[in-house]
């Protein structure tokens, strides 16, 4: 798919996510065994876990938004990754949005993050823990140059390379979305150990954070996985195509209507939202 078409799809998905959503009305996880249902951009979750706010290895940003819920596998991944980072003396992991208590569509900012299997992680590792004020209004560190063609060399750190690599090497991770310029720098720095690069996918924005996505849990029978990324390290023509100028669109994007919910998610809404 060419980049013009992908950009249009991204815009449409973002527009759909801005529509009013009833999922915010569910303020606690739905009781039951953990089940991720549907697709990453059209689904929900039963039995979500709450990521503990207090941890010596990570800090949770924007807790007032209450987007720190996810499948137990996601909570364990965050704890596993942040422990590895801490043991290597790299700094504190900054956790952004996961999902809402029952997953589902956000009213803005995300098209995915609906099944409790996605998390945003800042691409900075402070040596000194952030204050409560900093966590509530975090300052993102834009690692990408203005022209979008490379990272800012003074901001790019070996620890950020290692953070992304550690996440990609995790057995439960299927994709990590970063800006194309960040993917390009990873390709340059990777050396001969390159298998993990397959999971790192270029995507629009993502200049200051990585978006980590886990595979569907084996016992979540209604969860819809994505196809695996193409074979190879993704550092060749596919990556370079992201730096080609977009062709002007010939039509205005139409407002996209969100697709019907999976039946189990609709039933969940019918039961828990008046």
Swiss-Prot record:
Zn(2+) 2 binds at residues 147, 150. Its EC number is 3.4.24.-. The keyword Acyltransferase does not apply. Its main location: periplasm. Residues 1-19 form the signal peptide. Disulfide bonds join 44-265, 187-235, 216-223. One of its GO terms (biological process) is proteolysis. Keywords: Disulfide bond, Hydrolase, Metal-binding, Metalloprotease, Periplasm, Protease, Signal, Zinc. One of its GO terms (molecular function) is serine-type endopeptidase activity. Gene3D superfamilies: 3.30.1380.10. One of its GO terms (cellular component) is outer membrane-bounded periplasmic space. It is an enzyme of class 3 (hydrolase). Murein endopeptidase that cleaves the D-alanyl-meso-2,6-diamino-pimelyl amide bond that connects peptidoglycan strands. Likely plays a role in the removal of murein from the sacculus. NCBIfam families: PRK09429.1. Belongs to the peptidase M74 family. This is Penicillin-insensitive murein endopeptidase. It comes from Shigella sonnei (strain Ss046). The lineage of its organism: Bacteria, Pseudomonadati, Pseudomonadota, Gammaproteobacteria, Enterobacterales.
């Amino acid at each position: 798919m060419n980049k013009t078409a992908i950009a249009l799809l991204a815009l449409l998905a973002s527009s759909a996510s801005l529509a009013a959503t009833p999922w915010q009305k569910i303020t606690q996880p739905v009781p039951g065994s953990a089940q991720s249902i549907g697709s990453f951009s059209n689904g929900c979750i039963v039995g979500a876990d709450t990521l503990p706010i207090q941890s010596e290895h990570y800090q949770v940003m924007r807790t007032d938004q209450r987007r720190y819920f996810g499948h137990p596998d996601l909570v364990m991944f965050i704890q596993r990754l942040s422990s590895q980072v801490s043991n290597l003396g790299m700094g504190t992991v900054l956790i952004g949005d996961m999902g809402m208590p029952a997953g589902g569509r956000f009213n803005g900012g995300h098209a995915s993050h609906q099944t409790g299997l996605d998390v945003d992680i800042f691409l900075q590792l402070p040596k000194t823990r952030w204050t409560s004020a900093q966590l509530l209004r975090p300052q993102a560190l834009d690692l990408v140059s203005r022209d979008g063609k490379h990272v800012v060399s003074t901001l790019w750190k070996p620890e950020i390379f290692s953070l992304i690599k550690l996440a990609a090497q995790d057995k439960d991770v299927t994709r990590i979305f970063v800006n194309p310029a960040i993917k390009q720098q990873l390709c340059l720095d990777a050396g001969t150990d390159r298998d993990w690069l397959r999971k790192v996918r270029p995507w629009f924005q993502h200049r200051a954070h990585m978006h980590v996505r886990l595979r569907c849990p084996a016992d979540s029978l209604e969860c819809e996985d994505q196809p695996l990324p193409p074979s190879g390290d993704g550092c060749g023509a596919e990556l370079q195509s992201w730096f080609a100028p977009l062709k002007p669109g010939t039509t205005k994007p139409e407002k996209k209507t969100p697709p019907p919910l999976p039946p189990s998610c609709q039933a969940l809404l019918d039961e828990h939202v008046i």
